[in-house]
């Protein structure tokens, strides 16, 4: 079973629908014992980084997430969840979880697209990602598949954590992390077949990791 973190700042319901469609057992929860007992945790998020961190700290779920990582249990951050897994976000001048090094930066509206026109902020819609290194999440997904993005800020971790990139005014990190600890800036639950495959890959990894223990 997968646990979808419930901290009043996420898109938990849409993630659950996607997992239900795949036939993957899941529960939306804020219960530390349920989270600890799950094969893996999905950490979704929408809205502002400051508000999301405030909810995590208020509920104590920030420490639950850190313990999840320290114990080596699988974690997948989505959108704002992806951003606040880093050390810091420029949005609301937010000190984040510090699970993965790096910061989250605002897109510069003066940047231009391939045609020389100023980009619109937020970055909203389908865009192609480019895989930079092998990743269990991307097994069976075309190397330059398109996913659905909605965000004004983008993650900027050190190069060694960058798994895939996307270009929107600048090349930015679309997936970061390492084995069992991943963060995706796009919304896999809204990304059609590639997104569903990514979620299925995460579940498979979690199940295999749990069976190996």
Curated annotation (Swiss-Prot):
Question: What organism is listed for this UniProt entry?
Answer: Nitratidesulfovibrio vulgaris (strain DP4)
| Sample GO molecular function, one term | imidazoleglycerol-phosphate synthase activity
| Name listed for the protein in its UniProt record | Imidazole glycerol phosphate synthase subunit HisH
- One GO BP: L-histidine biosynthetic process
Annotated EC: 4.3.2.10, 3.5.1.2
Kindly list the GO CC terms recorded for this protein. cytoplasm
The UniProt entry annotates the active site at 79, 187, 189
This protein's assembly is summarised as:
Heterodimer of HisH and HisF.
Encoded by which gene? hisH
Pathway where it operates:
Amino-acid biosynthesis; L-histidine biosynthesis; L-histidine from 5-phospho-alpha-D-ribose 1-diphosphate: step 5/9
- Matching InterPro entries: Class_I_gatase-like, GATASE, Imidazole-glycPsynth_HisH
Superkingdom of origin: Bacteria
Catalytic activity reported: 5-[(5-phospho-1-deoxy-D-ribulos-1-ylimino)methylamino]-1-(5-phospho-beta-D-ribosyl)imidazole-4-carboxamide + L-glutamine = D-erythro-1-(imidazol-4-yl)glycerol 3-phosphate + 5-amino-1-(5-phospho-beta-D-ribosyl)imidazole-4-carboxamide + L-glutamate + H(+); L-glutamine + H2O = L-glutamate + NH4(+)
Task: Spell out the disulfide connections.
Answer: none
Keywords recorded for this protein, A-Z: Amino-acid biosynthesis, Cytoplasm, Glutamine amidotransferase, Histidine biosynthesis, Hydrolase, Lyase
The entry's localization annotation reads: Cytoplasm
Instruction: Provide the function of this protein.
Output: IGPS catalyzes the conversion of PRFAR and glutamine to IGP, AICAR and glutamate. The HisH subunit catalyzes the hydrolysis of glutamine to glutamate and ammonia as part of the synthesis of IGP and AICAR. The resulting ammonia molecule is channeled to the active site of HisF.
Every copy of the Glutamine amidotransferase type-1 domain together lies at 1-212
């Amino acid at each position: 079973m997968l646990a979808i973190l419930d901290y009043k700042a996420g898109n938990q319901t849409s993630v659950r629908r996607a997992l239900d469609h795949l036939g993957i057992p899941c529960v939306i929860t804020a219960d530390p014992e349920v989270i600890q007992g799950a094969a893996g945790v999905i950490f979704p998020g929408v809205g502002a980084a400051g508000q999301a961190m405030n909810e995590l700290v208020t509920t104590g779920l920030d420490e639950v997430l850190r313990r999840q990582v320290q114990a080596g249990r699988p974690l997948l951050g989505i959108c704002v969840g992806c951003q606040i897994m880093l050390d810091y976000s420029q949005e609301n001048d937010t000190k984040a979880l510090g699970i993965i090094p790096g910061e989250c930066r605002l897109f510069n509206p003066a940047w231009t697209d391939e045609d020389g026109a100023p980009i619109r902020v937020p970055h909203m819609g389908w865009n192609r990602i480019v895989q930079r290194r092998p990743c269990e999440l991307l097994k069976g997904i075309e190397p330059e598949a398109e996913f659905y993005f909605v965000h004004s800020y983008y993650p900027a971790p050190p190069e060694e954590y960058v798994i895939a990139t996307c270009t929107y005014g600048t090349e930015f990190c679309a997936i970061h992390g390492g084995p069992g600890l991943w963060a995706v800036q796009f919304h896999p639950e809204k990304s059609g077949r590639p997104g569903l495959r990514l979620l299925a890959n995460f579940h498979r990894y979690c199940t295999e990791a749990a069976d190996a223990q």
